[in-house]
Design a protein with these regions (language model features):
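Short, electropositive alpha-helical surface patch
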Residues: 60-68, 92-102, 155-164, 227, ...
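Soluble or luminal CAZymes and related metallo-dependent hydrolases
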Residues: 25, 57, 119, 123, ...
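C-terminal alpha-helical cap/extension of soluble enzyme domains
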Residues: 8-12, 36, 207, 214-296
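A general structural signal for well-ordered alpha-helical segments in protein cores
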Residues: 26, 62, 88, 124, ...
Length: 296
């Protein structure tokens, strides 16, 4: 069982102008992540526009990433976008056969109507019985279609089951991260914070890395913060402020703004998104300059 920790980018999905997955561009993007020193890759997630990918595309995407990474870092993926439990089971079983190192369950699909713990446990226990017993699992408090945070009891149940190796924590709340780190002690479950504003204090509190959207802009800086920040605390504090303020740019048309960023880097050719059809450079005045400043 591979550990999932460190800097874990939520991968973009490059598309061609005619709305097909740009696999040559994706291969270059994978190379870029690896050169930046990432510790794992989250291949099919919200940043990947998974809600706008067919099941065939999601499976092919995960398999492609696994093949191109060639074991250099762990690859995790989610990809269940249905509320219906039978459809979720089908989606997750297909994803489990792609060669990924951990299969990530989206918490809002374990409780689609926000009915509470009874529904959550019923869905979760069904999946635990039907998914391969030797497949490491993860949890992801994905913000869409709604952010379904785990209660402490639900979190502890998952941690103590021994099946779960990673939680992408989207609480965006340092006390919650601190509490979960304590609850997970003695279990395989690593908490990885996804909120840039608390990235550094969360790491200091025991978050095993970072998995926010700005891993698509400067994962190398997050890598330094996680792996070397403790040796230079003043520099780490200053860097954490820059990273926090930079991440506000997410609100200006993400993920299309990240694709424009990579288009300018030469990673891939098209900014095309399925989730965002806006001309974000016109909609958000000053975005073009901000993207250049982040790059520099």
């Amino acid at each position: 069982m591979k550990k999932i920790e460190g800097i874990v980018p939520v991968m973009l999905t490059p598309f061609t102008p005619d709305n097909q997955i740009d696999y040559p561009g994706l291969e270059k993007l994978i190379s870029w992540y690896l050169k930046e020193g990432v510790d794992a890759l989250f291949a099919v997630c919200q940043s990947s526009e998974m809600q706008y990918l067919s099941l065939e595309e999601r499976v092919e995407l995960a398999r492609f990433v696994v093949q191109k990474v060639e074991g250099r870092v762990p690859v995790i993926a989610s990809g269940h976008i249905s509320d219906d439990l039978a459809e979720q089971t089908k989606e997750l079983q297909a994803m489990a056969n792609t060669g990924i190192d951990a299969l990530v369950l989206v918490t809002n699909h374990l409780d689609p109507q926000n009915q509470g713990s009874e529904t959550f446990y019923a869905h979760l226990n069904h999946l635990l019985k039907t998914l391969p017993a030797d497949m490491p699992l993860g949890l992801y408090e994905c913000p869409a279609p709604y952010r379904r945070l785990l209660s402490d009891d639900e979190f502890s149940f998952c941690a103590n089951s021994g099946r779960f190796v990673v939680l992408k924590d989207v609480s965006c709340d340092l006390p919650t991260v601190e509490r979960r780190v304590k609850l997970a002690q003695g279990t395989p479950l690593a908490i990885i914070n996804a909120n840039a504003a608390i990235a550094w204090p969360a790491m200091q509190a025991g978050s095993k890395g970072f998995s926010g959207v700005f891993t698509n802009f400067h994962p190398g800086l997050y890598h330094w913060l996680y792996h070397h920040g403790a040796q230079q605390p003043e520099k780490a504090h200053e860097l954490s402020l820059f990273l926090s303020l930079s991440a506000v740019t997410e609100t200006l048309g993400y993920p299309k703004n990240a694709k424009i960023y990579h288009q300018r880097l030469g990673t891939f050719a098209s900014e095309h998104c399925r989730v965002n059809k806006d001309n974000v450079l016109e909609k958000f005045w000053g975005l073009s300059v901000l993207l250049d400043q982040i790059r520099d």
